Amino acid sequence: MYERGAFVADHVEPVADDQIQPNGVDLTVDAVLEQTEPGRIDTDGKTIGDRSPVTPTADEDSTDTTVTIQPGTYILQYAETITIPENHVGFVYPRSSLMRNSCMLHSAVWDAGYTGRGEGLFEVHHEITIARGARVAQLVLATGDHENTYDGSYQHERTDTRPGE
């Protein structure tokens, strides 16, 4: 069963009232990256390929900082820090505005115990301009029955509280 948006909002930081939806919380764009070097996934580990940010531009019609993205595959980083509570699992879905503009956002399962500022795989099929801070995805939380919580290499990603540092 999915939790209500107000419950999800308690596990997202920062969050504005207009991000809270009936069944989840909208996530916003922090950065868009392009992978520039190959990665590798082995049986005993992984290497994430080098990435570089898509260069933002100042929008002459507003105070927003925007990026114009050409067709291709990118990494979209979210601005919010997410904490998935025990006995829950997180799912991130694209907002319909992305799909209506020939774009798609993919995400892996967000395990209980994960804390961090995550990212998604962003497919662009037609040029689009996106403002930093634009709402592009929705996080929902479902109840889950599991024995352990997340303790992997992405714990506390892109936050100031990485263990052991």
UniProtKB/Swiss-Prot annotation:
One of its GO terms (molecular function) is dCTP deaminase activity. Residues 39-64 are annotated as: Disordered. Coiled coil: none annotated. Residues 39-49 have a biased composition (Basic and acidic residues). InterPro entries: dCTP_deaminase (IPR011962), dUTPase-like_sf (IPR036157), dUTPase_archaeal (IPR023537), dUTPase_trimeric (IPR033704). One of its GO terms (biological process) is dUTP biosynthetic process. It catalyses: dUTP + H2O = dUMP + diphosphate + H(+). The keyword Chloroplast does not apply. Its EC number is 3.6.1.23. Keywords: Hydrolase, Nucleotide metabolism. Pfam families: DCD. The keyword Hydrolase applies. Pathway: Pyrimidine metabolism; dUMP biosynthesis; dUMP from dCTP (dUTP route): step 2/2. HAMAP family: dUTPase_arch. This enzyme is involved in nucleotide metabolism: it produces dUMP, the immediate precursor of thymidine nucleotides and it decreases the intracellular concentration of dUTP so that uracil cannot be incorporated into DNA. This is Probable deoxyuridine 5'-triphosphate nucleotidohydrolase. It comes from Halobacterium salinarum (strain ATCC 700922 / JCM 11081 / NRC-1) (Halobacterium halobium).
